[in-house]
């Protein structure tokens, strides 16, 4: 199973379920019921800052699975059929890789390195940034597209399909409906600005033709 395959499954799982990066990286197969297309989301894999090493002057951090701060962050979500198919194949591929590996640290994790250890969140960021640089994707303001923007995209797609804001709030597990509304409003304004810029270009070309 190639690294590119693992990243692709991770990105599409985050997008399809509106997950946070840490939530996806902490997923375990026991949290996923593929037969009934249901997933239990809650903990988050994070790198915690350690104590300062007096000799080196550096802090030794550690990876840890952190429980959600709010009750709404723990939830059972329905899995889109496309993501179910993706995860089924990923499970088969991972099992084959695990059998071929000399060492495999944790057979329960959904997303791992080539030796079964948790994926470092910073490495996920690096892989995502490399993909965006390769295909030339940026945000309208010129800044980098973040992994977290996949979550925002999920909200926008759901709204575009006619899903009500309260349901989207439950899917993204926001504690406040206002948070969900603010994200969608911000993204809508960006889309409207791009549309206005496109119209401005069209009008300019029309003006030159009309002269």
Can you say where each PLM-predicted feature lies in the sequence?
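A short, basic/aromatic helix-end/turn motif that makes direct DNA contacts
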Residues: 26-32, 169-175, 183-186
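Residues in the helix-turn-helix
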Residues: 23, 40, 167, 179
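Active-site proximal loops enriched in glycine and acidic residues that flank catalytic Cys/His/Asp
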Residues: 14-17, 21, 28-29, 36, ...
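C-terminal secondary-structure termini that scaffold catalytic or DNA-interacting sites
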Residues: 36, 43-83, 96, 103, ...
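Short, basic (Lys/Arg/His-rich) helix/loop patches that form interaction surfaces
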Residues: 1-8, 17, 77, 92-102, ...
């Amino acid at each position: 199973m190639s690294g590119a395959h693992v990243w692709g499954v991770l990105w599409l799982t985050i997008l399809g379920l509106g997950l946070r990066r840490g939530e996806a990286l902490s997923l375990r197969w026991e949290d996923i019921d593929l037969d009934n297309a249901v997933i239990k989301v809650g903990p988050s894999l994070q790198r915690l800052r350690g104590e300062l090493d007096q000799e080196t002057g550096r802090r030794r951090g550690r990876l840890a699975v952190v429980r959600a701060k709010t009750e709404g962050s723990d939830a059972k979500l329905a899995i889109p059929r496309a993501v179910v198919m993706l995860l089924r194949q990923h499970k088969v591929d991972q099992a084959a890789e695990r059998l071929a590996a000399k060492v495999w640290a944790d057979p329960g994790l959904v997303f791992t390195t080539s030796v079964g250890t948790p994926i470092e969140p910073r490495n996920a960021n690096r892989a995502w940034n490399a993909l965006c640089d390769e295909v030339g994707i940026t945000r309208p303001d010129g800044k980098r597209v973040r992994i977290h923007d996949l979550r925002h995209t999920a909200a926008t797609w759901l709204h575009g399909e006619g899903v009500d804001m309260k349901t989207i709030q439950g899917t993204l597990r926001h504690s406040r409906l206002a948070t969900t509304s603010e994200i969608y409003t911000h993204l809508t304004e960006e889309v409207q600005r791009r549309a206005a810029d496109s119209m401005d270009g069209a009008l300019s070309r029309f003006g030159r033709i009309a002269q």
